[in-house]
């Protein structure tokens, strides 16, 4: 069957047990798409929002890789495991003597910039080899702490020893490690039992669709699920160009900000999304030093 040149963004609700790449391949087959990519992996043991990019949208997937993420997670206090989640072997168990007030206080301590040591069971590489390969061989290698930012951390429910929380965090944050560190702060240890991603940058789980629902849908129904390419860029200020400026922009020319009908509402050096007079997305540019410099262009005007 012929592949289709599709442009857009699919908000997929990935199930537990499926890798991000397998989810992408299934969606790509269902859409018969020529080109597709995801915006950063979601662990097989995690469920939730996995934005998939088709066609021209793949040019902007890096923006979501850099974006903050929001998760809902459940940790079990009193039990530490080798992997930091329910898949690992139990390392030790301890009594849970804290109450809800202590849990709330512990969560509050982790808001802001924190330093995390990446877990051994992770895809980070050391000497070209993923850390999880060392871990599976029973080896532990030294890892440097990394600074990440916890934007928000709120208690959802507390049914000790199980605690469910919602966290919004910067790129590179390990929620498993966060749960373990909170457990240590409470003096009893912890491991993650559930992880569900509910937000990636400006995108949310609210309008996501499952693979089963896509499988049962008609092609027209599936296509209607695709958000436009600029769904990835909704936080960027908007610039509109007249026909002459749009032509120059699409040829990669830098435009003087003084030539624009309205200056972009962006900080110096800020990125903006650029449209023509018919509201067709032309691409992304950077407004800096009095010029609008094309950064990524949309070929099809998706």
UniProtKB/Swiss-Prot annotation:
It holds the Pfam family TruB_N. The active site is at residue 43. It comes from the Bacteria. One of its GO terms (molecular function) is RNA binding. Its EC number is 5.4.99.25. One of its GO terms (biological process) is mRNA pseudouridine synthesis. Keywords: Isomerase, tRNA processing. It catalyses: uridine(55) in tRNA = pseudouridine(55) in tRNA. Belongs to the pseudouridine synthase TruB family. Type 1 subfamily. Responsible for synthesis of pseudouridine from uracil-55 in the psi GC loop of transfer RNAs. This is tRNA pseudouridine synthase B.
């Amino acid at each position: 069957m012929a592949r289709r040149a599709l442009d857009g963004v699919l908000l997929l609700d990935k199930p537990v047990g499926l890798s991000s790449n397998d989810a992408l391949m299934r969606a790509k087959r269902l859409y018969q798409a020529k080109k597709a990519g995801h915006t950063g992996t979601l662990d097989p043991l995690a469920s939730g929002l996995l934005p998939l990019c088709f066609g021209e949208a793949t040019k902007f997937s890096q923006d979501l890789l850099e974006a903050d993420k929001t998760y809902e997670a459940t940790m079990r206090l009193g039990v530490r495991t080798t992997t930091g989640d329910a898949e690992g072997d139990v390392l030790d168990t301890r009594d849970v003597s804290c109450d809800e007030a202590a849990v709330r206080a512990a969560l509050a301590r982790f808001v802001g910039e924190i330093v995390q040591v990446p877990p051994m069971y992770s895809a980070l590489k050391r000497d070209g080899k993923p850390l999880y390969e060392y871990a599976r061989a029973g080896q532990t290698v030294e890892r440097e702490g990394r600074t990440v930012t916890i934007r928000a951390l709120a208690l959802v429910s507390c049914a000790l020893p199980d605690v469910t929380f919602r966290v919004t965090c910067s790129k590179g944050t390990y929620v498993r490690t966060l749960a373990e560190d909170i457990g240590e702060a409470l003096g009893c240890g912890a491991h993650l039992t559930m992880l569900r991603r509910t937000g990636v940058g400006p995108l949310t789980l609210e309008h996501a669709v499952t693979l089963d629902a896509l499988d049962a849908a008609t092609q027209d129904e599936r296509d209607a699920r695709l958000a436009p390419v600029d769904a990835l860029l909704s936080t960027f200020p908007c610039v509109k160009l007249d026909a002459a400026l749009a032509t120059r922009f699409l040829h990669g020319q830098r435009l003087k900000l003084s030539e624009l009908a309205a200056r972009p509402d962006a900080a110096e050096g800020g990125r903006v999304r650029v449209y023509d007079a018919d509201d067709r997305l032309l691409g992304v540019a950077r407004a800096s030093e009095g010029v609008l410099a094309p950064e990524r262009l949309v070929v099809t005007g998706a």
